[in-house]
Amino acid sequence: MILSICPPHAALDVAREVAGFNGIYLDANAISPMRAQEIAEFQQRYVDGGIVGGPPDEPGTTRLYLSGDETSEAAALFAGSNLEPVVVPDASALKMTYAAWSKGTAAMLLALRDVARHFGVERELAAEWARSMTYLPERLAGAERSVAAKGWRWAGEMDEIADTFAAAGEPDGFHRAAAEVFRT
């Protein structure tokens, strides 16, 4: 089995590099369902995957969503590990819709902070959040920490999410903008 976990922009190139591999190719990248279909064309035994959660340091914290014809064999390799395999109809679609919220809202908070800073009301916004939406100051702090380390990768993920929204006939502008927030 080849397990591909790389930044979204490299997923197709990695699949091309190993085209013709006869084993299971498990793509667990943050890619759109359309990109997953494109990658499947290069692999005979393709499994679409999507990871939700942080590093699997302990059981129950990280899921590996799987879809495709070879999911049983792929799931068996992770059974009993800290990475919980879960078979779903479309792993990439689930990953995209989950990350649209979890990482998309991080981009929104960062942009809101920057707009408030621009207009000189950052402190006042933080004070209002502390009063009326008590979870947001810590969520913003978490977004600031995460984007410093992972923003470059999340930008590509937002592009993939935007493509997913467009394919579903939904507006894609928010996540295209979120990609720009992560690029700056």
Where are these regions (language model features)?
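Short, composition-biased local secondary-structure segments
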Residues: P7-E17, G80-V86, E128-R131
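Residue-level detector of anion-binding/catalytic polar loops
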Residues: M1-I2, R45, E84, E122, ...
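Helical "substrate-binding/catalytic lid" subdomain
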Residues: L94-T184
